[in-house]
Amino acid sequence: DLMFTHYARTFDGLAQAQTQMDRCELAGYLEPRESYVSILELGLYEATGKIHASLEERGLKRFSPEWNSAFDELLQEQAQHPRNAGRLWARIPQRRYVCFYPMDKKREGADNWYMLPFEERARLMLDHGKIGRSFHGLVTQVISGSIGFDDYEWGVDLYADDPIVFKKLIYEMRFDQASARYASFGPFVSGVQFSVDELSTFLAGEAVPAMRVIEAVQV
């Protein structure tokens, strides 16, 4: 199997990449099996809670036009913060191994994520995030939202220099309440990541294609 991953700033950019892929000679030898479209996003429960408190202090009625406008403005400030902007407009992590899986939050009887109060969801995600942070430096995680774009609600990409890290991280998260009670997972895909110019090596089947780290270009 061969998985292509492409980041673009617009949907038109994704469409252009798809068109170019369809037109190349290699496409005639490939049989498409799956595709996934999503947008990079950040978990901002803590920041959102602070924004809610700020708007309430200003006397704004929850979810009124004034509230929504002020909320969007403050959230945009968060998106433009250097720490967050670098993650929202990231490039594909250049690590040797990759694992991808889609997931949903459950909406089943008492296990309905979307019926929980915001504060409870924030608490659960804080605990969930602590597990991920315990693997800091060992894995690069990219979360993307796909509600309205694909069959699942989120896509999770994990990149590491040791594939065993994927197993350890995902196993630990299985015991976290946000996952154990409220998460539903799709199929997992994992493999070796390699540079585009190593495609001929992969197709020849004579050696494992290499992953060459390319320095980021400052724009």
Regions found by a protein language model. Give the residues of each.
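Short amphipathic alpha-helices in soluble, non-transmembrane regions
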Residues: 16-24, 168-174
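Active-site loop/lid in soluble adenylation, ligation, and acyl-transfer enzymes
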Residues: 5-14, 22-28
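Short S/T/G/P-rich N-terminal loop/turn motif that feeds into the first structured element of a domain
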Residues: 9-13, 41-130, 200-219
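A cross-family "folded-core" feature that marks the main globular domain of proteins
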Residues: 15-19, 31-34
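C-terminal structured interaction module
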Residues: 161-209
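Catalytic micro-motifs at enzyme active sites that drive phosphoryl/nucleotidyl and oxygen chemistry
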Residues: 21-24, 87-89, 142-145
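Short, well-ordered beta-strand segments in beta-rich or mixed alpha/beta enzyme
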Residues: 1-10, 98-103, 148-173
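Short, glycine- and small/hydrophobic-rich beta-strand elements in well-ordered beta-sheets
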Residues: 1, 27-42, 128-153, 169, ...
